[in-house]
Amino acid sequence: MARDLIGPALPPGFKARGTAEDEERDPSPVAGPALPPNYKSSSSDSSDSDEDSSSLYEEGNQESEEDDSGPTARKQRKNQDDDDDDDDGFFGPALPPGFKKQDDSPPRPIIGPALPPGFIKSTQKSDKGRDDPGQQETDSSEDEDIIGPMPAKGPVNYNVTTEFEKRAQRMKEKLTKGDDDSSKPIVRESWMTELPPEMKDFGLGPRTFKRRADDTSGDRSIWTDTPADRERKAKETQEARKSSSKKDEEHILSGRDKRLAEQVSSYNESKRSESLMDIHHKKLKSKAAEDKNKPQERIPFDRDKDLKVNRFDEAQKKALIKKSRELNTRFSHGKGNMFL
């Protein structure tokens, strides 16, 4: 409002000089580039209040005009307002018609496998949670209250008769399969009948070089052999012995070797005396025959004889004699080509 003046009024055609406050309210013309449309200059609170009052006055006039023009004018005004909202914050030339306007921040290209259909990115989920945090809290509280399996979402088709029929069919299949399986022999798996592989000493073995190249362990199959396996192995050993004896018999002496052997034996009998071993055996046999014929008498106790201390038993004695007899085979001539 203009201040009430005291004194004579100015004649018509002359403009009254305003005060300092009026000069602040009325913006002076700006020298230089002006701001683009839809942008407001930073002004004081008084200018904001004046603009608010003027905008209210303009809105009232617009409403009155809309009432006068009818619904068509309202629709045009609404479309114009929407266009103004879309154009806010846009600088530069506008896109031609038919082109889609891009967002302010286009999404970055995804590096790696894409998400399957129906899944949402974590960023979108977080944005949704920020938009309505109240709804997110209610959803989480509802999920915490639920205990146990969720009810079925779709319709449940359950029939007692169909369930009984399915069960009977399963039992029938089981029985028929069992008859087929009974004819097959039951065989245990390999891990039940075989020993596991030998475990090496992880850092606990001897820290020396091997003395023998073929340092192999014995036959470990005796731990898992069944009676049938033992019988089969015994038969194999017997057959191997028979084959070795047959090979020895195959070395038949030739006629020349036989003739020379007879000549050597006749020469030894006529020219050479008996060996010490044969003489010793003859003495033992004669002594044993004399001891049998002697009458038995009471003998005083002899510790070495009666307790048989430091003496060979019969088994050791027979083994030693048998081993001594093999000296002739070890250091004698071969069975073939006896004579040069």
UniProtKB/Swiss-Prot annotation:
Residue ranges annotated as motif GPALPP motif 4: 112-117
Lineage top rank: taxon: Eukaryota
Location of N-acetylalanine modifications: A2
Coiled coil ranges: none
Listed Pro residues bias regions: 107-116
Sequence ranges of Basic and acidic residues compositional bias: 124-133, 163-187, 227-261, 269-279, 287-304
Motif (GPALPP motif 3): 92-97
Sites bearing Phosphoserine, chain numbering: S28, S105, S140, S141
Keyword annotations of the record: Acetylation, Isopeptide bond, Phosphoprotein, Ubl conjugation
Pfam families listed in its UniProt record: DUF3752 (PF12572)
Motif (GPALPP motif 2): 32-37
Acidic residues: compositionally biased ranges: 60-69
Motif annotated as GPALPP motif 1, chain positions: 7-12
Region (Disordered): 1-304
InterPro entries: DUF3752, GPAM1-like
Cross-link Glycyl lysine isopeptide (Lys-Gly) (interchain with G-Cter in SUMO2) residue location(s): K271, K308
Entry-annotated residues carrying Phosphothreonine: T138
Cited PANTHER family: GPALPP MOTIFS-CONTAINING PROTEIN 1
This protein's name: GPALPP motifs-containing protein 1
